[in-house]
């Protein structure tokens, strides 16, 4: 492989108007072959997340890494590593960010790319179009909320009406633009979280970290309306998890494959 500086020459310091320029490690390639070489180089790094690594640990059915007889970890090749790195590198060049930062904040969930919520907030704050995001939290008091409860029985998906009583917190993400105009997201509420099925999912952080989840969701809603060029049509990791069927039918476990990156729900 040629010298890294030749493979990925530094991008000029003038970044796109919608993003903040990075002062270290932003790379740009000039043709497809250079991009492939750069992606291959990045996939060999131990600093990139699992989805982008050429070699990943083999795990048993309990999620524990397996080892060889000599104690070294068992590894298997990830066939998607180079292509994932290539996509991340392309997005980094388009957005004016360092590829490693994109990889650390772009997750693959159920086959879909998703931004970390912290990255969405940071990108909005750094884009230069607005003042830093603010969050307005209001407690509307205890409320009994009806929702549709779905479940599987004899291979069929059924549903019934159920209720849950909770403190109905609401959140609006807002800021002002350079002209002083107030811009705000739609109101996100715990009632919405229940009715949309986010709250009652197994392991849902809406039950234990309501304030944080409200802020994350409000920021994502704000970004899609007022800064779509930053999100590029990609949802937050929290949203993608919540969009997955709340009650999927269980299926037999298949042979071990390279697993998608496992990340906590409060990213």
What residue ranges belong to the model's regions?
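Glycine-rich anion-binding surface patch
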Residues: 2-267
